[in-house]
Amino acid sequence: MSMGKVVQVIGPVVDVEFSLDTDLPDINNALTVDKGNDETVVLEVALELGDGVMRTISMESTDGLRRGMPVEDAGRAINVPVGKETLGRVFNVLGETIDGGEEFPADFRRDSIHRSAPKFEELNTSSEILETGIKVIDLLAPYVRGGKIGLFGGAGVGKTVLIQELIHNIAEEHGGISVFTGVGERTREGNDLYFEMKESGVLEKTAMVFGQMNESPGARMRVALTGLTIAEYFRDVEGQDVLLFIDNIFRFTQAGSEVSALLGRMPSAVGYQPTLATEMGQLQERITSTKKGSVTSIQAIYVPADDYTDPAPATTFAHLDATTNLDRKLTQQGIYPAVNPLESSSSALDPEIVGQEHYEVASEVQHVLQRYRELQDIISILGMDELSDDEKIIVARARRIQFFLSQNFHVAEAFTGQAGSYVPVKDTVSGFKAILAGDYDDVPEEAFRLVGNIDAALAKAKEMGYTQSEKAVDQD
């Protein structure tokens, strides 16, 4: 292996000089710096500066590095453990375990984090719906097995909680394998998620990879590739359907922006790296379904200052099959999950995929909510009395629909004191169909807030002192 030495350290950027008589390392190769006392730091080659000097990005803290320290070229990219043994374990960007358990032996199978996307002829398209048990998603923006889904929202609107609920529901109801990748988010949230999943028994079907916000930009930029590499093994070798959760894909872009500036590249719009679209494409094109298996990706996407035209979320949009948009106004109204039913969308909301009844109910729900939005200006200025009788009925049903789109989550039980609910798609469709038909016009609208199916809403109404009318009994 080629040997070099450290010649310059600027934060996470390390310049390494190799003799021109030896083979220079390739771009993306892993280099190891020996700090002494059995301590090493892993670098990744990013640029060749000339005269045998390679500019690298450190995957760890560069504290303690000095000029002249010996550097060894590994002759390959960073590689990480893959296989069934990774389930139930927690890794960092380098594939080292960080859960206090045993390290994987040196001869364990490892794959490179830098790989090509599957070839065109290997790809497979699927139109099978993935049931999540979350009403607003299953009804209005259904997820496709093997698709890419984006959870958009500003700070504190519930992206991470929604991802945790999806992991819980898919593990409990579908028994599927999941890979959770924490990219540049809070370490506390990752710690909470680990112990919650351990207690609920979901962890044994999940591999977790973390590169959190206190780590170097190199680690945050590459950790998504580490998680994806573990998921690709289950797809390509085991032939399984895998769920890949990334929280948060914006931090991947943000880390890339930091690295780009450190490498001296000229920034583009809003200070982002000029290679933004390329980096995003290289990651997203690997997240796909092949004839062997599928990777269904659910990505939380932070929207800076709630601005959807920002280049980071806008670049991500192009790769998605479905978008789930979280709205701060709904959190202020106490509607959770705060999914905006009019701005969320899915390519799978098609009668040939979800069925004619589901499609018609979803379309009518969106129509009623859109009409309610249009009437809100009149209501706020002139009051409800200025509406026609038909418009008053639309407003009443829209409010019931809006509340019924909310539900309690299993992962939030400790905070809310309310049991979470998983609602099958057929129950969701039949419930909204009955509300649209006017079967529950006399049921108090508050009864529909944060409940599971229609039966739960009627039980809540009964607790509120409501007695079913003969019409509702007949329809029920």
Curated annotation (Swiss-Prot):
Query: Does the record's keyword annotation contain Cytoplasm?
Result: no
Question: What is the protein's name according to its record?
Answer: ATP synthase subunit beta
**Do you know which SMART domains this protein is assigned to?**
AAA (SM00382)
Family as reported in the entry's similarity comment: Belongs to the ATPase alpha/beta chains family.
Q: Which positions form S-S bridges?
A: none
Keyword terms, alphabetized: ATP synthesis, ATP-binding, Cell membrane, CF(1), Hydrogen ion transport, Ion transport, Membrane, Nucleotide-binding, Translocase, Transport
The task this protein performs is described as: Produces ATP from ADP in the presence of a proton gradient across the membrane. The catalytic sites are hosted primarily by the beta subunits.
Reactions this protein catalyses = ATP + H2O + 4 H(+)(in) = ADP + phosphate + 5 H(+)(out)
Subcellular location, record wording: Cell membrane
Complex formation: F-type ATPases have 2 components, CF(1) - the catalytic core - and CF(0) - the membrane proton channel. CF(1) has five subunits: alpha(3), beta(3), gamma(1), delta(1), epsilon(1). CF(0) has three main subunits: a(1), b(2) and c(9-12). The alpha and beta chains form an alternating ring which encloses part of the gamma chain. CF(1) is attached to CF(0) by a central stalk formed by the gamma and epsilon chains, while a peripheral stalk is formed by the delta and b chains.
Q: Which PROSITE patterns does the annotation name?
A: ATPASE_ALPHA_BETA
Q: Which domain of life is it from?
A: Bacteria
GO MF, one annotated term: ATP hydrolysis activity
Positions contributing to ATP binding? G153, G154, A155, G156, V157, G158, K159, T160
Topological relation to the membrane, as annotated = Peripheral membrane protein
- GO CC annotations, alphabetized: plasma membrane; proton-transporting ATP synthase complex
A Pfam family that this protein carries is ATP-synt_ab
Give its E.C. classification number: 7.1.2.2
